[in-house]
Amino acid sequence: MPQISQRGTNMPQSPIRKLAPLAARAAERGIHIYHLNIGQPDLPTPTIALDAIRNFKRTVLEYTPSQGFLSYRRKLVDFYAHYNIHTTPEDIIITSGGSEAVLFAFMSTLNPGDEILITEPFYANYLAFAISAGAVIKPITTTINEGFCLPKVEEMEKLITPRTRAIMICNPNNPTGYLYTRREMNQIRDLVKKYDLYLFSDEVYRDFIYTGSPYISAMHLEGIEQNVVLIDSVSKRYSECGIRIGALITKNEQVRQTVMKFCQARLSPPLVGQIAAEASLQSGEDYLRDVYDEYVERRKFLIDSINRIPGVYSPIPMGAFYTVVQLPVDDSEKFCAWCLTDFSYENQTIMMAPASGFYMTPGMGHNEVRLAYVLKKDDLAQAVNVLARALEAYPGKTI
């Protein structure tokens, strides 16, 4: 029988989605599941975007330019200017989601065996994209006990080898909700400059910063303009995960030319998705403010509530809509599966993402989960109550 490729064998399962079959069977048994496992916003997509789809008049669903519609890229220039990110339409490449932007960035800049430093815990699909590019992730370990802040620059510098080609950050961070400080961003800049590395910066959650701290984009950092590749997406900002529209932005012409080869090979980004995304830029600040205010309330409610459960601890996330939570359990992956297979409270249970899947270092995150506060407050209240009941009943509890 023909063999599966080594690349395919090495490809990890998603820690966010691999429990889905267990959830499906629980739902078949009539169990109501509170989904805190995945960053799927429940807030309405802008009406203007939905209207653009409803009023779509074309008679042919044609290919779009491989770089994306020029009209959309021009409007993005104005959008980014509000964040003091100064770019041109030529600097922007529209992708099929932020995920494709990361994949194409890796494929365009990393050779097989090259190393990329990424702060852990990190968005699990980064590992899949690195494997696809033949690259090796070297984790910069951060811990829940220190609030997921970066280690000292000397510790980070020890990880750099002759094979190191890039550093990647997600700011604000998925899965931790951590927001890098000016000092930390300068620390990263100095390493990028000293060793002439690429800096990949996933800034999908820039609109969700809750501390009053300034948003510092990688494109704000002086002296590394040719090293920075910025990743963006409409998925979270406008609750448009399903239209699969992202962007790769860089001042580095050689990188853009190489990325465009991959863009041409996949032909074009989604037609209807670009129409909706372009229309969303007209939704105005009121829409983003309402979304922001809702997440502020959910964040406060969830963190206050779960930190009242005995043995449970979550730092206060500064951005995005996730938090990593420490639980009094022997193994969070077993606990998450048990919640779906062997537990229910008043015919309800909870689905979470085991945090071990967001770490590269073995043993890290073994008693942690990632929660996404993407449910209404009433549902969050029920979910927290169910979690507390589950922890009381779980055979592997540690308190």
Which functions belong to the PLM regions below?
Residues 63-96:
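Conserved N-terminal alpha-helix of the aminotransferase class I/II PLP-enzyme fold
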Residues 2-4, 8-14, 19, 25-34, ...:
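PLP-dependent class I/II
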Residues 59:
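Basic nucleic-acid-binding alpha-helical/helix-turn surface characteristic of O6-alkylguanine DNA
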